[in-house]
Each structure stands twice: as structure tokens, then as C-alpha cells.
């Protein structure tokens, strides 16, 4: 379905909203709080590093491309991670993770951490921890915190610890 909208104005130079500000996602937190609309800050962030990529069809940038049909896959030794730079400090309050449950429930990320820091010289600090996860799509909220850099750190990539493949279809940070 494609929707188009137009507005007629009498102004010579009407205000324009960048397309990037129009990308928003409606969320309902796992704790049942009311749905809110958030902007995915990773859409504007620079991907600066990852632990690995399985092949050219499963690269790290696919974890934040907004397409749940593409994914980042890393079969290197755990922990697996993907790092982003917002370019400046941002206040974040939550995140969304879409796992590979569509490939089988065994591929749902079991344990991971959202981490942050404000300088490349600082140690990563855990902002939120997801453990013993069984959900394919997870939405989490936490106390607002300001960071410049954010990392998804996957320590147990699957439900069966003998399988070693981090498979992330989408990662969003708000």
C-alpha cells in the first residue's frame, strides 16, 4: 500500500520537514505501558564497528535499515557486537530488537546488552540487559541516559548455546 499526501499552501517558501523526521515507530513496551511514538536514533547514527559479518548479504548495516527481511549475521566467536556513533550525546530511553525467530525459535537472541559511553576511551557501561529472552520482538524502556556511542553486545546468540550465530533483523534505539 502506498499513501501520498499533499497540502496546498499560499506561502512562497513553506516549511519543509526532512524525510528522516517522518520515520517513526509506534511502540508498546514489554511491561504493558501505553504505546508511544519514537524516532529511531540509529537511522542517523554512524555504524563504526562490528565483531563480524557472515557474508555480503548479512552485513551489519542491515540491522538498522528498517527492513525486517534483511539481517546482520555474525558467526564469529561470542561475544558479538555492533557499535554506533550518534555524532553527539543523545538522551536515550528505550530500544527495540527484532530477532531471527522467523527462522526458528532457536535463533532468538537469548542474552544481550545495550551499552553506551560518551568517549571512545571510556569503558562500555550497560544501560539495559536482556536475559533468558524467548521473544522474537522485544521492546524495552529504561531510565533516560545520555550517550554518544551505543553498542549491542550479544553474549548468547541463540536459545541453544551450541549454535553460534548472532542474527539481528532490526535494532532501534530511542
Task: Give a label for each model feature.
Residues 1-27, 37-48:
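Extended hydrophobic/Leu-rich segments
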Residues 27-65:
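Predominantly extracellular/luminal regions of secreted and cell-surface proteins
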Amino acid at each position: 500500500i502506498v499513501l501520498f499526501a499533499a497540502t496546498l499552501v499560499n506561502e512562497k517558501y513553506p516549511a519543509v520537514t526532512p524525510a528522516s523526521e517522518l520515520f517513526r515507530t509506534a511502540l508498546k513496551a514489554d511491561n504493558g505501558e501505553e504505546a508511544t511514538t519514537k524516532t529511531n536514533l540509529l537511522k542517523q547514527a554512524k555504524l563504526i564497528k562490528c565483531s563480524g559479518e557472515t557474508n555480503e548479504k548479512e552485513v551489519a548495516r542491515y540491522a538498522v535499515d528498517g527492513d525486517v527481511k534483511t539481517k546482520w549475521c555474525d558467526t564469529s566467536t561470542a561475544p558479538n557486537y555492533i557499535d554506533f556513533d550518534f555524532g553527539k550525546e543523545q538522551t536515550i530511553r528505550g530500544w527495540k530488537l527484532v530477532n531471527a525467530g522467523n527462522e526458528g525459535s532457536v535463533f532468538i537472541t537469548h542474552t544481550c546488552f545495550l551499552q553506551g559511553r560518551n568517549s571512545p576511551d571510556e569503558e562500555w557501561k550497560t544501560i539495559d540487559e536482556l536475559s533468558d529472552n524467548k521473544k522474537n520482538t522485544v521492546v524495552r524502556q529504561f531510565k533516560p541516559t545520555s550517550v554518544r556511542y551505543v553498542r549491542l553486545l550479544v553474549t548468547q546468540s541463540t536459545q541453544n548455546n551450541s549454535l553460534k550465530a548472532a542474527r539481528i533483523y532490526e535494532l532501534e534505539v530511542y
